[in-house]
Amino acid sequence: MEKTELIFSFDTEDFTSNKAADAILTEAEILRSEGVRGCFCLVGLLADQLVNWGRKDVLDALRYHEIDSHTLAHSVHPVINEYTDIENFDAAYSEVIRQETEAIRKIRRATGCGKIYVAVPPGDDKSYAAMYAYADMGIPIYADTVCDTPEGDGGWYCNVYNIEYVLGADGEDFFFRGGEAEIRAALDRLARRKRAVFYTHPHMSLFSRHWDSVNYNKINKHPFGEWEEAPRRPAEESERFYENLRLFVRLAKEDPRFRITTYGEIAERLAARPPRIVRKEDLRLIRERLREKLYPLTEPDSFCLSDLFRAARAHLLGAETWECRNERGFLYAPEAAKEPAVLTAEELRRSAAALPASGFLPERIDVGGKTIGPADWLLAAYEVLCGAETVGIEGGREQLPSLDRLHLARDLSLKGTWIHSYSFEDNWLSDRLRWQSWTMRF
């Protein structure tokens, strides 16, 4: 029986309170003393603060663990969703690159860490623009995502490998007031998954409210450095939490159903896979799978629809093979052919020559004076590549694959969530995330 991969992940974020840094130290040392490496996802501003506060003890403790990124400024407005919810993708993307490059610089300067394997967005900041930016920055994994399956299979979306957060210790009352029975029941639930992330916010072991709920809810409530401290928990609650955290770690280590791992180990395993290549001998199998369903393929390799689109273009133009790379979906909703049409092989080849070789995909395509959708074009292209001289297409075909396996992305609606500002409208983010479904693959 395949073991469940279990990751211990820590949203290490409170840059407003030196007291909260004590919790980072405690949780890091609990794991180290049990022989387990955690993944501490650090906010860039907190990395600076740990240096400013002289917290060498915390920085030394973190060196045992994997260090990753939890954005530059977490909840400081405008947060990632607020500044990327604009029509101009290039402007949104560039600002993510600017801020998150600075975050990594701060994290590395403070901790001395090497490669960053995962980016964890704060709260509900699920921005397609950030996902593309992280991929292009060389960060291979995006965690606390809405683009994982309910079973924890993982998968690529916007060119990053997506892993869902599953069990948050500080969000479960039993970690503060319960004990072994509740912990064993939680492990039973996690063991049903292929992969599970157990996570904490270290500051919440000492405080009863999140630091950003008192300082950054909707607005930046105070000048930087003049923050409120969140209400503290009774000491006995904190102690019970730490006892239960240690117990959870021990029981997970002893449980043969689990294999404890890190984001880095998963990323290295994924990176070791051979290049994904669409070969001429694959075209008939691809055509048959696309006839069955407009959906990413798992054979002959892991291919997203954007991979297949670029490969079809290349093969129509005479290529023998196409090596897949980072791809993109759509900036606007793709539009189907409005009525049935017949396309010739020569028209398809001419249209391929006019298509861009990279970047976002076109929402509509002209083929011999007929306007069709990208899915219409994709299916017709593979028919031609398999020998057809003419291809009939239907009108009104669905242009996007089903997101039922990624139901959180399918149902995403970000307006009014988390600490977003009153002016945040979600004019683009939720829809554009769904329009990137052509980059989904497993």
Enumerate the predicted regions with their spans.
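Metal-dependent polysaccharide deacetylase catalytic core of the NodB/CE4 family, i.e.
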Residues: 37-129, 150-153, 197-200, 265-272, ...
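Alpha-helical scaffolding segments of alpha/beta enzyme cores, especially the outer helices
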Residues: 26-29, 56-57, 102-106, 129-136, ...
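Catalytic domains of carbohydrate-active enzymes that cleave complex glycans
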Residues: 34, 126, 142-144, 148-149, ...
